Every structure is written in structure tokens, then in C-alpha cells.
Amino acid sequence: KEQVDGDAEWAEAQPDPNPNDKMKNIFLQSRDDSISEPPANAGEKIVLVDSINHALDEEMAHNELMVIYGQDVAGDKGGVFTATRGLTDKYGEGRVFNSPLAESSIIGTAVGMASLGYKPVVEIQFGDYIWYGMMQIRNEVATMRYRSNGKWACPIVMRVPVGGYIHGSICHSQCIDGYFAHLPGLYIAYPSNAADAKGLLKMACRMEDPIMFMEHKGLYRQGFAASPEPDKNYLLPFGKARIVQEGNDVTIITWGALVQKSIEAARNTGLSVEIIDLRTLNPLDMETILTSLQNTSRVIVAHEDNLNNGFGA
């Protein structure tokens, strides 16, 4: 009681926050924005789900404090999409293990583990069920650095399969990026191909802020999303969009599964179409977007979501 009373008196005696500091400590103030391109001598072509597996494998070897857990991620199953297959055998049940079927528990325990110095990389089996962990994400994960004035951090990675095109119906096809892009303090990656997925996930595993890593399950094994595999040194910083193809008549801004659909839609239009793959939704690469619009003066935003109020809106 004496300690609590003393802490309360100390808090009461502190000056009011400076309004000029209101935007500080949402994220770590410094971030490595240097970009590394895939080497010319990249390896064999791999599909997106295998690039996720390889990125996790390399980062587990890189950081002995990294742990992976979620529903059915351990053992021979390696998750419903096999993204973690083989990692339990390689790193042991103490570092790759199954969790209860409880998203709030998965995310809540990750907050605690991160506070102890671990690097939790958790899998939410389907984005459609992440809502059970919404309180933890909104009020704990995304705000940890801000509400502690930079003294604490919550550097967890939440891997979340999202999107349609797998006959998953209403409970296995949801697009959730618009909801989470609204939250300050949460980075969001959304790759469209295997090389970007590997580079972004490896970078996410080394960042000091919380990451929501969205993986479109309709792209996991598609040939058009496969890429020559970058080596273990490839890190792709957040906030660096990719010019998929250059053009002068109109700009298409897109991400995830709609990148390939935009390429196909533009093919026979007779127009010179520039296509931008955002790669990450937060941070958003406004520099690349504005540079393109200065050239084309026209824009189409192509995104997979409900009709109203998606991230593209």
C-alpha cells in the first residue's frame, strides 16, 4: 500500500503532457528505411506459402528468442496452410508450439512474452476469427509504446491469412485490412508475391513495433505469385511500394490478390497503365503514389473488400 500510495503521489505531481508531443512514440522514432532489392542470382522459384515458411525458418535461426505459436502450427501439420511445417522438428516444442483455440489468449500471451524480451510470431488461423482478440490488439498491442511514453514496446508479429478465392464462404474469406489500418501504432504488411512476402516477413521479425502480417490465402500456391527466392540476407523495409509496370494514362493502386487482377485487366485496354503494388498499408508510400499521379493525373484504386469503407476508400 505504501508503494502504491507513493507512486500515486508521484504521478499526481507530474506536469501535464505537452500537446506538441502528442504524435510522439506511436512507433519507434527511428526505422531502417534502406531498401535491398532481390539479388540477381536469386534461387529457385517458390510459391508464397513456402516463402513464409523459409522466412520463419531463417529468422528462428537468427534470433534464439523468437517463438512461433498458434492453432495447429506445431508438429507435422504445420498449420492449416503448412506455413510452419517442419519448424517444430527443427527448433523444438519449446519454440514452436500449439495454442488453445482462443485468439484473445494467443495475442494476450504474446504481449506478455514480448514484455519479457521474447519475439512472439503468432498465427491467427483465419482473419475471420481475429475479432476475439480485438481488445488486446486495439487497447494493448497498438498502444503500448504510446501510453508508456516510449518506455515499453510490443514488438510482436501477427500472421493472419485473409481474403477470398478459396470457396471459404462468409467465415473464411473476410478482408480485414480496412479495420486495422485505422489503428495508430500498428504496422500492416500485405504482400502480393513470394519474394516480397519473404523480405517483408523477415523485416517484420526484426522490427521493434507490432506488425500485422496479412497473407492472402488465395495466393499461397498460385503460380503467378511465385518468385525466385531471395537469400537469407534479403530484408524489405516497410513503406516502399513497387511499380509493377509503368504507364502514362492512368495509375492503378492496389495490393494483395488484386495486383495480378489489375495486370490482367489492364492488358487489353489499349491504355498505358501504371500499376503500383503498395506492399504495406501502414506505412503507406505516399511519395510513390503522388509521383505517379503527377504523371498520369488519373487513378483507380483496386481493392478486395465490402462495397463500403474498405481501405481503398
Stretches with model-predicted labels:
Residues 1-30, 34:
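Intrinsic-disorder/low-complexity detector
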